[in-house]
Amino acid sequence: KSRMNPQTQYGADVIMRADHALEHGVEQLTGCIRNVVDEMLQELAEEAGRSTLDICQVSVVGNTCMHHLFLGISPASLVHAPYNPAISQGLTLNAEQYGLHIHRKGQLLMLPDIAGYVGADTCGCILALRQDQQNEISLMVDIGTNGEMVLGNKTRLACCSTAAGPAFEGAKIECGMRGGAGAVDHVVYKDGKWEYTTIGNKAPAGLCGSGLIDLVAQLYLAGFIDESGHLESGQEKAGVFVLVPPEKSGNDRGVYLTQKDIGEVQLAKAAIAAGIFLLMKRLEITEKDIKRVYLAGAFGNYMNPESAAAIGMFPAELLPRIQPVGNAAGEGARIALLNEEERKEMDRTVKNMDFVELAASPEFQDCFVDGLCFP
């Protein structure tokens, strides 16, 4: 079961919500997220023919800011250097005190946060994918406004968070939108013709993240975009590529891509590429040592890995090893709910993880700039 995050009314991303909390207090943000979780618990109980009073434990994961706001903790420590979470261990709490109307002795279970922008949701991914128990080295990437990554195996794990920006979630893109009905989700240039699909087979209304990456990749591979990201002339309007004209769209503007949109994609993919490179450097390994690449989250499930590799988001050598894993954070929360020993083990794993602070890395800027160009 899912709902749109009600906190979006206070800010489009976690940074804006954190700023709102610092200026106006956490009460509004805390109240609305607790209420929606409690409402969904009631809906799930009704669908199962049970009472919420039968629920004895609830496991919750989320990014560090969401984690703090759910608990009613100020996110002040997350927006000021050194960007450390206020709490970094797993918690077992009284659920009723946090607005969840379950069994009167019901427990709220929270996996630990790792760093300021690597949260309990990343712990859930590690737990679901068993990265900390594998002999082979794997890379997990959860692409969103912050691109969280974990690289390693049972011997050593390193993680980081890159400010990928909201482009892949449809923000800051002229015709961008979330992955809803009418969003162009896949694009192919074939035999001189543009083909695309939309979510729900509705009239095209905009570009969601997967469609955006496909479109940029296809434009680059077909020679409409050069290595620097410059959109070649030839369109009716300079610096604009029209995929769907207004008369064929579900709106009066059509679906198109601007030069600025391409720049936003370059910024996002360069941040992810730089994060991967610096994690490999920290562990002193190369692409050939990475045996699996897990793409977590809803976006990773729908993104075409070939398009991501084509624009340089991932090293091309990793393409055959890429595996979408869907809602790994949610699966990790389920495992944590059912296994106390796994929760304890995750606390130990987090304490031993190597967090790479990209903002403090003298090499990050060079890697980032190198990653702006298309390969």
Predicted regions and their residues:
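Glycine-rich phosphate-binding loop of actin/hexokinase-like ATP-binding domains
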Residues: 1-13, 76-90, 124-211, 304-326
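N-terminal glycine/serine-rich phosphate-binding loop of ATP-dependent small-molecule kinases
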Residues: 1-71, 77-79, 109
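Phosphate/ATP-binding catalytic cores across multiple sugar-kinase/actin-like superfamilies
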Residues: 36-48, 122-125, 129, 266-288
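Short glycine-rich phosphate-binding loop at a beta-alpha junction
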Residues: 50-63, 216, 288-297
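Short glycine/threonine-rich loop-to-helix capping motif typified by GTGT followed
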Residues: 63-77, 285-288, 297-316, 358-367
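Acidic, glycine/GT-rich loop-and beta-edge segments that sit at the periphery of enzyme/chaperone cores
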Residues: 107-122, 335-375
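Catalytic phosphate/nucleotide-handling subdomain of diverse soluble enzymes
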Residues: 153-155, 285-349
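A contiguous, well-structured pocket-lining segment that forms one wall/lid of small-molecule binding clefts
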Residues: 220-283
